[in-house]
Amino acid sequence: VIDGKPIFLKEHFQRMSESINLSGIEGNINYEEFKNSVELLIKENSFKNLNIRVSYFYDKKPLTLFYFIESYYPSKDEFAEGVHTVTVKMERANPNVKSFQKEYKDKVTRIIKENNAFEAILINHDNTVSEGSKSNIFFVEGNKLITSPDSSVLLGVTRSKVISVCEENSIEVHKRIIRLDEIESF
C-alpha cells in the first residue's frame, strides 16, 4: 500500500492463487473478495504506507486473513552504498510457493540479527544462490542483469516487475545458476 492505494493487486492475487494451487491446499480464493478485503482493510485503518500480509488457511473450509505488517525500505544512502548481507545455507521446500515456514523464518531472523545484516542470501546445498530470504536477488554484470532461474525462486510480483522494466528498456536479463563463489565478481 502506497499513499493509501494498493499496488499491483491483480498480480499479488495471481501469485497467491498460484501458491495455493502449487501447495496442494484445497479451496480457492475469489479476486473480488480479495480486492474488497484489501480495500476495506485500508479504509478502516489510518495506515497509508504499509505492506499487507494475506494468509490463507484451509481446514474443512477456507479462512483468509488480511492484516498490515511492518515494512522497511532502504534509504537513499542504503540504495547508493549498499547494505550488509550474510549468506546462509538454507533451501525452501518449494521456492515457487510463498508459504509461512516458522522454522525457516526463525532461523533466518536469528542469523540476520546475529550478523547485524539487512538480508540473508539463501545458498542451496550445491553452493548455488537462490534468492534473498525476503527479497529478490539481481546482480549486474556489465550491461546485463543476472538472476537465478525461475525454478529456484519465488516468482513474485516485484521480480516480475523488475524483469519487465529491464525488457522495456532493452536491458538483457539472464536467468542462470549463480555459484556462491561468483558473488564477489559482480
Model-predicted segments: where are they?
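Ordered, amphipathic secondary-structure segments that act as subunit-interaction surfaces
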Residues: 47-54
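Phosphate/pyrophosphate-binding loops at sites that engage ATP/ADP/AMP, CoA/4′-phosphopantetheine
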Residues: 41-46
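Helix-start/capping segments and mature chain N-termini
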Residues: 1-40, 59-186
